[in-house]
């Protein structure tokens, strides 16, 4: 039985929606207090999700702007920094943890921004002929259980030995944000589906006609959760799109390649994941991420008390220009 040893995390986006913060710090390096109470760049939290789910090697697909920042973060402390942290055991433990991560890390550069599918294709030599976990470099996950979101997905792959995507039930009004699948439950499983159609960010009318899933409430669909376990056949499908310049909105899309893999006869599954995803690439999503991590942390009681105090105060005036963000 094949086990998933490798993960690919795409971190090549420019983070334009987080301007002006991303003028000086790349989106993936934005700081968050994790559930252990330690402040880390978001990308470290995402890498730890993979490693603590059983992954052994991680490839980050980066761009020429963020590569140096990421390499610097995962480099050993300089002598001067070691002196600064002398006697601070928690910091030295974190430094040791970062060195352990660095030993498992490979960076691959996407030469130009040509879409999510192209970023994944850039990792083909790292992946080789193995199945791999694919994650987004701007999504943080919480499960609220002792099984991380990535581990839930890996368990399904190991049981069925075929491509599988994490999904969540999502209402019609959010379909424009996510790839969406249609499928039927596998046997008596309450959460695993045999996928028979995949569509990137469908219109509501298309979804109602073509993507309804038996058993889901009306107006709810199975949408991508931001992580997948894929087989090397995805690179054949992506390579075909790149060789034939099959772009959508001027980019090479992963979703179309996933559908091409399925159409060629490979079984494709989806699993409803227990947990939540948070997008740090938008201002409100970033705020949501920090709130979720804080509420799930060792500072939970203090955070809840602070929220109660804040909610007791009338909200500040929000300028008209920012009300839709």
Residues of each region from the PLM?
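Conserved core of the sugar-phosphate nucleotidyltransferase
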Residues: 142-228, 232, 236
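Conserved beta-strand termini and adjacent loop/short-helix elements that scaffold enzyme active sites
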Residues: 108-110, 166-167, 271-273
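Conserved N-terminal catalytic core of the sugar/cofactor nucleotidyltransferase
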Residues: 1-12, 16-20, 34-134, 141-145, ...
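Residue-level signal for inorganic ion chemistry
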Residues: 43, 123, 138, 181, ...
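Conserved alpha/beta core of the MobA/IspD/sugar-nucleotide pyrophosphorylase nucleotidyltransferase superfamily
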Residues: 2-5, 185, 206-325
């Amino acid at each position: 039985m094949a086990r998933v040893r490798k993960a690919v995390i795409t971190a090549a986006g420019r983070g334009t929606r987080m301007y002006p913060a991303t003028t000086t710090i790349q989106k993936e390096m934005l700081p968050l207090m994790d559930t252990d109470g330690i402040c880390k760049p978001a990308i470290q939290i995402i890498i730890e999700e993979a490693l603590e789910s059983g992954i052994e090697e991680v490839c980050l697909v980066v761009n020429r702007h963020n590569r140096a920042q990421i390499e610097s973060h995962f480099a050993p402390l300089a002598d001067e920094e070691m002196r600064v942290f002398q006697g601070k055991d928690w910091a030295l433990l974190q430094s040791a943890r970062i060195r352990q991560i660095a030993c498992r890390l490979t960076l691959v550069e996407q030469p130009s921004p040509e879409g999510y599918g192209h970023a994944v294709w850039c990792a083909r030599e790292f992946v080789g002929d193995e199945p791999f976990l694919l994650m987004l470099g701007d999504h943080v996950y919480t499960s609220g259980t002792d099984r991380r979101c990535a581990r839930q997905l890996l368990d399904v792959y190991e049981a069925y030995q075929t491509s599988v995507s994490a999904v969540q039930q999502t209402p019609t009004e959010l379909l424009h944000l996510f790839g969406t699948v249609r499928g039927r439950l596998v046997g008596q499983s309450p959460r695993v589906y045999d996928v028979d159609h995949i569509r990137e960010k469908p219109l509501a009318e298309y979804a109602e006609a073509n993507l309804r899933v038996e058993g889901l409430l009306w107006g709810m669909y199975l949408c991508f959760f931001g992580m997948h376990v894929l087989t090397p056949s995805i690179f054949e499908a992506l390579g075909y799109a790149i060789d034939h310049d099959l772009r959508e909105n001027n980019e090479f899309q992963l979703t179309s390649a996933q559908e091409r893999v399925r159409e060629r006869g490979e079984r494709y599954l989806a699993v409803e994941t227990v947990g939540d995803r948070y997008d740090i690439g938008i201002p409100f999503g970033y705020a949501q991420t920090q709130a979720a991590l804080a509420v799930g942390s060792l500072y939970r009681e203090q955070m809840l008390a602070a929220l109660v105090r804040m909610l007791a105060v009338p909200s500040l005036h929000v300028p008209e220009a920012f009300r839709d963000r």
